[in-house]
Every structure is written in C-alpha cells, then in structure tokens.
Amino acid sequence: MTYQWNIRCLTAVEQEVQQQLEKELNISSAAARMLVVRGIQTADEARAFVRPSLDKLHDPFLMKDMDKAVERLHQAIIQGEKILIYGDYDVDGTTAVALMYRFLQDLASSLSPLTFNLDYYIPDRYTEGYGVSTQGIDYAAEHACSLIITLDCGIKAVEKIAYANSKGIDVIVCDHHTPGDELPNAVAVLNMKRSDCPYPYKDLSGCGVGFKLAQAYTQRYLASRLSPNSLIALLPLTQLLAMSIASDIVPITGENRILAYFGIQQLNQAPFTGLSAIMQVAGIEAKKLTINDLVYKIGPRINACGRMKSGRAAVELLLTDDPVFARQQAEEVNHHNEDRRDCDSETTKEALAQLQEDPTFANRRSTVVYAPHWHKGVVGIVASRLTETYYRPTIVLTAGEDGIISGSARSVGGFDIYTAIDSCNDLLTNFGGHKYAAGLSMHIDNLLEFKQRFEAYVADHIREDQLQPTLQIEAELQLADITKSFYNVLRHLEPFGPGNPRPLFVSRHLINHRDTRAVGKEREHLRLDVTDRVNAITGIAFGRADMAEYIQNGNAVDICYELNENTFNHYTTIQMMVQDIIPNKKLSCC
C-alpha cells in the first residue's frame, strides 16, 4: 500500500512553547515537541498529562437524566427489587455488564440486612441480534425483574423499551452510540451524545457510561461511608473500563485517558481472577501488560465468545473469583478465538476473491460484499481487513433469517460512514453505530439498490485524499535523538490510541550499517540495521523484504517508524517498528 507522509510542523508560537517546556522540564527538544503536538502549553499541563488523576473526572450529575437514573436505582435497592443488567455481546457490552454487576454485587454485600437480587442478560448474536431484544424483555418478565439497566445498547430501542414498559418493567439506558430522532421512553436515558446533554466529555465507551452511573450512585449515597475519596472504592472497576476503551476504539483523551491509565495499573497490580487467567493464556508477562495487549490479545479473545458462541461466557469469566473455573473458562475462550481466526481468515480470502472478480470494483469508491454462508461473528473483522487492503468505506454482509441480511461497516480516516448509511435508511430494517463503525440489516431484495445508493453517496462526499492512508508524522529525528531518556518520555505519554496516537517519526538518508536482510519463514520481512554515518539503530519492517537489496546496495532511504523496546538475552535496546520505507528524497512538513 502507498502512503501519504504528512510531517507535522510547529508554528512559531508552538516553537516558543517547545523551548519553554524543554527548559522548565529539563527534557530534550524532541521530547518537548511530543508534548506540544498533544496541545500541551505549560509545564503544569505536561505534569497533569503524564500523571492522570481521578480528581479530574467530571461530575457524573452533569449527564442528562443522571439524577433520575440514580434515584430509580436507589429505589430498586432499598425496596429489594430484582434488577436485570443487559449488555451487548462485544467487549464493551460484556465489560459493562461485569462492571455494573460487580458494583451492585459489592453494594448488596455491604447493605445487610437490605437485599436485592441481580441477574444479567447477553443477547444471542444469531437468534436475537444486536441490542435490546423481545426475548431479553420476556426473560426479565419471566424472572420477575422490575428494572432493566441496558449497557452499550438501547438508545434506538424505542419499540422494545415500550414493550418493556407494557410489562411493568422500568428501563435505565446507558449507551454511547449516536441517538436517533426519537429517544426511548425510559426512566432515564444516559448518553452524552444526546443533543440536550451538557456533559462535557462526549467520547465515553458504553462501559464508561455505566461507570458514570456507578460513580454517581457512590457520590450520592456512599460517599460518607467511603470518605475521604469515594472514587478509590471504584478503582478496581477501571480494569474493565480499560478493556472497553481499548477494544471499542474510542478516543483515549480526557476521561478515557484517565480511566484507561488507572485500569492498566489495576490489571498489572491486582487483576480480577478471570482477567488474570486470560492474561496467562494469552502469554502476557505478569505486571507488563500494555494497551496494545488489550487491543490485540485480550480484546479479541473476549470478543470471540460473542462471535463464535455466547457473550455470556465472557461475562462469566469476568465475574468469577474461582481460579480453577477461571482457568477452564479462559482456555475455552482461547479455543473460541482460534476458531474465530480460522473463520475470519477464510472469509477474508473469499471476500477478496469476490472483489477481484468484479470488473467494476476498480472504479468504485466503496466496498460492499455479501455471501449467505459467511459467519455473522466475523463480518466486522473482515470489513476491517478489506478496509486495510483497499482503503475504502467497507460493508460486509451475510444472511440471517426470513430474507434479512446483516453485517458490519468500517470507514477510512475522516469519512463518516454512519451518515453515509443513514442516507439509505429507508432500505434498512435496523442500523446503528458511529462515524467509523456501524452495524446494519436489510431485506435481501434491497441489497442491489443499497449498494448503488451507498456508492453514490460515498462518491459524492469522499475526498481523494481520504482514499489514501496517511502517516501523520510527529517529528523528524536524528538517530542521536533516540536515547533512553527520550524513550522514557514517550512511555509517559501512554496509553496510546485514537486521539493520542503512538508517535510516528521519520529519519532520513539512512544507509546500511552491517546486517540489513530479509527474514521470516518466507523471507517476506526486513530486519534493518541502518546508520546515519554517526549513530546506528536496528528495526523490523513487516512485509518489506522488497527493500532489502536496495538498501544492501548502499542506497539511502527515509524511514517512517514507531519506537519500542526489544529484549533479547536479557539485553534491552530501542528499535524501530517500521511503518514505511521510501528511497531518500526531500521531505517537507505540511
């Protein structure tokens, strides 16, 4: 894939701030630049950024309907009602259910002789689909639940919540997806994206909204028992939040940064029993978990439960305090993930073949593929893989029941796929999501018209530069800049993710040092050993063995890369994780 390189230049004012931070914090110019690029203007702001504080969390009662939600929850608690915690089957939904269940379970154990009952429900991906289902409400009625708390779903469940009301069941909605034109008639609708909600931070995960409800209840009814800082009691729950934030690809800014920071600390210091087991199965070294481990190792395993079997298995793992059961459940979850990998690999091959056989595909601005036999649990992953391959807004669909097909959508940088799908909503039976990812369903008879209208919308609204991936480079470094102290500053910028990306750097006019060569089973990767004639560094470039001979022949290259640590034989070095390599040329910042 060909990338655009966009090198960030500092304005004159930013350069002054950089110099001031360098002086006041006693850090290198390159390190100060990393802070400036993140909008940091003072030494105090820098300290607050690298040392997140729970005190910086917003008052949960700023969220519309929070007062109503807390009072209805309190009523259920003191009257001994049965509460059903209802969540989606993905990581965000299952962690949200586990968070709320743990919070209320701990509360119940401390309120003796007051008692209230808890249950939870995860819809079946295949028989019920996403969100609040009729079956779930019937389950609540059959089990005498008088209050449902929905997590990571419910914002568009107008008819389903009306159905719950008809059965005498109250509902509190905790969701973060984009609301529709009509809100459900629930006791409380907690969603910071409501047009009438003044809550200052708009990017919480579904689990994050659930946490704000727990925070609000604690603040109102438990603070006197937990003083001086009632938030400390909620600290263990942040490990579930970190998982949801990492896996749901929400911005790691503001409150999400604070919650993810403390959540990763909790996972490394005192993980829940089930999470400790899944970390062991995933091969994560104790006390060294990073947000990348959540994104690429833990999240996919938890998601695999809902994709291949049932999200309930994930919640059971997240709730258990039995180490024997946790290990058994973690092994089962791992098995589901292996099945998922095999399935998504085969489906991706079939989808790519379908596109390659389509003579019109080369001229289209969007990708829509469908096959009736594809596994519903992997269409989102396949959509992501197709987006990575062709870099176009992508929808992958498969068959359901009664002529209904459903699937997942993924977008490219800067393009709002939710709005694009919404332009075709008269053809859909259901859809929801946000700017970069969505789910949708329609009758099979509408597929052809949908493809045509979706393509027309994308073609009219997408810019040419959005059809080519861009590497947003934060700084040009000399190899002499790459020191242990500089790398230590980078580590303090973690956790990385959307809104706080892992820094990309460029170093220019590098040549072979000693041992640049192709590596890997198929000799498809490139091990770099390069120098700027003064300093040297090693690195790895996956899938770029095509550049081996060029570099070995003495030609100079420009390299775009991230930095990480590599430990071999107990010796740790800083190395490049290469994103792109091009022949040396004059580069300018944009």
What is each model feature region?
Residues 74-75, 181-191, 530-535:
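Acidic-glycine-rich active-site phosphate/pyrophosphate-binding loop
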Residues 150-205:
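Histidine/acidic-residue-rich, glycine-tolerant segments that coordinate divalent metal ions
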Residues 176-177, 375, 434, 525:
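Histidine-centered active-site/metal-ligand motif
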Residues 75-79, 323-329, 335-369, 402, ...:
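Mid-to-C-terminal polyanion-binding domains and interfaces
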Residues 99, 182-225, 234-246:
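Short alpha-helices
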Residues 146, 187, 558:
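Conserved acidic residues
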Residues 2, 10-147, 167-168, 219-447, ...:
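Hydrophobic helix-and-loop "lid/oligomerization" segment in the mid-to-C-terminal part
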Residues 5:
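Structure-specific DNA junction-binding interface
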